[in-house]
């Protein structure tokens, strides 16, 4: 701002000086013109023709001068604008230089910060290198220790596992052998048990059969004895009846021969019917009974035959009503037949009840057998080891049940067949037996005798056989039971031992399995630890690789930063050298700026005086215009007057012509002075147009002829050594990579066409101009 004020004050001072100089020149010209006008008035009037021509020339010259003045004024205004623009450009250049210096300072600060960062990074890198080396060393030590521990633990565990495996294999082999032996023993024991059970069942069945046979033999003996007694009684009765019949036959053989035959036939038929009824009832009873035998059937038949013979042999009793003897006999026979039917019905009902009781017993036994089968099945489910034996037993029991049921059905069918056969046989044999009754009585007597003898023999044999069989059976059963009990005890002891051994083996197997499980868990834990350690090692290796990568990146950055630092240091060296040159130039520039400021002040004063002169000249030019116009009017009037008074006043015309010629001479003088002033203005134009180019650079200026450089410093001044004619531009690139300032060449040729006298006369000091090449400085 102070500089602008100074420049504006210098300009105003120079303009005032220029105006004052112009006014002085006008004042000098005016007395000269007055003096010349007075001299011209004295001249002759012969110059009137020349005056007209001169007036025309003056008009033309005035026009040309007016045009030149307008052009000069336009040039002056344009040059003022250029001066303002050059001042702005100089200010901008100074601001750019300040910015460049600030950027240089910032770059220095950044370089210092980068140096600090690089130092910190170097420290960190060195620290990280040491830490990495320590980590790697610790990792290697830990890895080696862990590998050694793992190897030792694995070797120990493998040895322990091998020893335990060998021991377990031996134990397993022993247990397998023992189990095989035990299984063989168990199979043999099971087979022996099965054989013994089969033997027991067979002996039990034999005992049951023998007991049944004994009971049957006793029952047969009892029935035989009873039948013998009944037969003896019946034989006695038959003998008595036979005697009676013989007596009756002898007494009434002749009289009742025909009737007796009819009655015998009727009674035989009736007896046949009653006998058939009784035999039918007896057959029904035998069909329903399950334990009837052929011997009992024959005894019953014998009893029935005896009853029929007794009924047939009843004597005929005559009735008082005039009935014959055979009719009374038939009536007497019907009554006991009805009684016999009732008794047979009672017997049948009793037998039916007995059969129902037996059926209930059989059903109860069947239920018991089924319950036993169920119990056996439950025991088979509970006792898995004896399942085969129990299943075989249940199968055998079921087979026995099926066999019993089949035998039962076969017995039923046989009983039915026997009964049917017996019925048919009885029906067929009744007729023959009735015919053979007489012959059979004799045979019966013989048979009774034989039977008595056989009975005695049988009783003796039965007693002997019973005693022997019972003794043998009891002895054999006792011995077999003792043997079986001993075997069962031995087998039970063996089973207990085997169970104890089995429990021991199970406990050992459990212990071995627990040991194996613990060893497996330990192995799994070791494997897990190994995996964890491997994972940790992998993580550490990954971290190491990442740290190595970061270290390499930091190294690269460090190398790049070192390269940048070297470049920056080189650039700083160059900048320092340039700064030294700038500092050297600074003093020169300051001294020159002081001189230039003094010259500028003087020249600004001169410019002001020139401006004042220009104003005065303009004022004088306006006055001259007015005078010229007035003169033209006067000339026109004078011509008119001269035309009117050519003959009257020739003397007056000559005087007027002389005055006009003097005025013309004065005008010519003023025009000459104006031409000189215009020439001085033309010199100003030449100075302004022919001034050298001064391109400003941010970093420095180098000269071409004398190798002298121009630099801009902080005091916003230009410095040079010996006023070189021209300063050629040089370019320098900024040292830092982040910011670069474009350098512009500055050239400052000084024109030597005019001398120092002309410069002082013009009153211009340093003038800045701007063109395509840069800033121009004219002195």
From Swiss-Prot:
Region annotation (Disordered) ranges: 1-55, 253-274, 315-336, 718-764
Biased composition (Low complexity): 324-336, 733-752
Record-linked InterPro entries: FPP_plant
Keyword Coiled coil assigned: yes
Keyword annotations: Coiled coil
UniProt feature, compositional bias: Basic and acidic residues: 1-14, 256-272, 718-731
Chain segments annotated as coiled-coil in the UniProt record: 47-200, 337-674
Family note: Belongs to the FPP family.
Oligomer and partners: Interacts with WPP/MAF proteins.
Protein name (database record): Filament-like plant protein 1
């Amino acid at each position: 701002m102070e500089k602008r004020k100074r420049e504006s004050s210098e300009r105003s001072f120079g303009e005032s000086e220029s105006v004052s100089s112009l006014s002085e020149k006008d004042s000098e010209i005016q007395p000269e013109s007055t003096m010349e006008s007075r001299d011209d008035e004295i001249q002759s009037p012969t110059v009137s023709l020349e005056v007209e021509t001169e007036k025309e020339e003056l008009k033309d010259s005035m026009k040309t001068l007016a045009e030149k003045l307008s052009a000069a004024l336009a040039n002056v205004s344009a040059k003022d604008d250029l001066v303002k623009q050059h001042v702005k450009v100089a200010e901008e250049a100074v601001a750019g230089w300040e910015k460049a210096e600030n950027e240089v300072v910032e770059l220095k600060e950044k370089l210092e910060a980068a140096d600090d960062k690089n130092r910190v990074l170097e420290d960190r890198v060195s620290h990280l290198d040491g830490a990495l080396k320590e980590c790697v060393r610790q990792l290697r030590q830990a890895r080696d220790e862990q590998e050694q521990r793992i190897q030792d633990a694995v070797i120990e565990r493998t040895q322990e596992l091998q020893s335990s495996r060998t021991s377990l294999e031996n134990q397993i082999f022993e247990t397998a052998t023992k189990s095989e032996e035990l299984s063989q023993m168990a199979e043999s024991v099971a087979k022996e048990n099965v054989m013994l059970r089969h033997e027991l069942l067979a002996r039990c069945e034999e005992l049951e059969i023998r007991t049944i046979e004994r009971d049957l033999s006793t029952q047969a003996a009892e029935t035989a004895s009873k039948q013998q007694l009944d037969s003896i009684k019946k034989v006695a009765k038959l003998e008595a009846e036979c005697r009676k019949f013989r007596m009756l036959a002898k007494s009434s053989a002749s009289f009742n021969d025909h009737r007796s035959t009819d009655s015998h036939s009727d009674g035989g038929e009736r007896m046949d019917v009653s006998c058939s009824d009784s035999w039918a009832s007896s057959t029904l009873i035998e069909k329903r009974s399950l334990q009837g035998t052929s011997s009992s059937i024959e005894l019953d038949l014998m009893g029935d035959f005896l009853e029929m013979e007794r009924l047939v042999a009843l004597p005929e009793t005559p009735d008082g009503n005039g009935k014959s003897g055979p009719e009374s006999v038939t009536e007497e026979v019907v009554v006991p037949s009805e009684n016999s039917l009732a008794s047979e019905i009672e017997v049948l009902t009793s037998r039916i009840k007995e059969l129902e009781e037996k059926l209930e017993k059989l059903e109860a036994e069947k239920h018991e057998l089924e319950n036993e089968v169920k119990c056996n099945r439950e025991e088979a489910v509970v006792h898995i080891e004896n399942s085969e034996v129990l299943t075989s037993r249940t199968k055998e029991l079921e087979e026995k049940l099926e066999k019993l049921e089949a035998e039962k059905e076969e017995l039923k069918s046989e009983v039915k067949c026997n009964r049917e056969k017996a019925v048919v046989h009885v029906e067929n044999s009744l007729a023959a037996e009735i015919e053979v009754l007489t012959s059979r009585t004799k045979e019966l007597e013989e048979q009774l005798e034989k039977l008595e003898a056989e009975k005695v023999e049988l009783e003796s044999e039965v007693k002997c056989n019973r005693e022997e069989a019972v003794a043998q059976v009891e002895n054999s059963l006792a011995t077999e039971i003792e043997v079986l009990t001993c075997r069962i005890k031995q087998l039970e002891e063996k089973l207990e031992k085997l169970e104890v051994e089995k429990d021991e083996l199970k406990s050992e197997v459990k212990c071995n399995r627990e040991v194996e499980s613990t060893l497996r868990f330990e192995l799994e834990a070791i494997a897990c630890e190994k995996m964890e350690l491997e994972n940790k090692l992998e993580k550490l290796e990954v971290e190491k690789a990442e740290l190595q990568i970061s270290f390499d990146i930091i190294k690269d950055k460090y190398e790049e930063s070192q390269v940048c630092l070297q470049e920056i240091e080189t650039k700083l060296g160059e900048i320092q050298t340039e700064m030294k040159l700038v500092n050297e130039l600074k003093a020169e520039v300051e001294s020159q700026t002081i001189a230039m400021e003094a010259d500028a002040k003087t020249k600004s004063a001169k410019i002001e005086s020139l401006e004042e002169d220009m104003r005065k000249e303009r004022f004088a030019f306006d006055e001259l215009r007015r005078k010229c116009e007035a003169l033209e009017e006067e000339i026109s009037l004078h011509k008119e007057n001269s035309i009117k008074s050519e003959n009257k006043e020739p003397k007056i015309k000559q005087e007027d012509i002389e005055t006009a010629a003097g005025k013309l001479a004065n005008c010519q003088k003023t025009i000459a002075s104006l031409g000189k002033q215009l020439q001085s203005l033309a010199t100003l134009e030449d100075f302004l147009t022919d001034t050298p180019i001064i391109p400003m650079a941010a970093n420095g200026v180098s000269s071409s002829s004398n190798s002298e450089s121009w630099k801009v410093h902080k005091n916003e001044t230009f410095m040079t050594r010996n006023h070189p004619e021209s300063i050629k531009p040089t370019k320098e690139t900024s040292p830092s990579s982040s910011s670069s300032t474009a350098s512009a060449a500055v050239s400052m040729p000084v024109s030597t066409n005019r001398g120092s006298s002309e410069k002082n006369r013009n009153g211009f000091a340093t003038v800045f101009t701007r063109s395509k090449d840069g800033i121009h400085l004219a002195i």
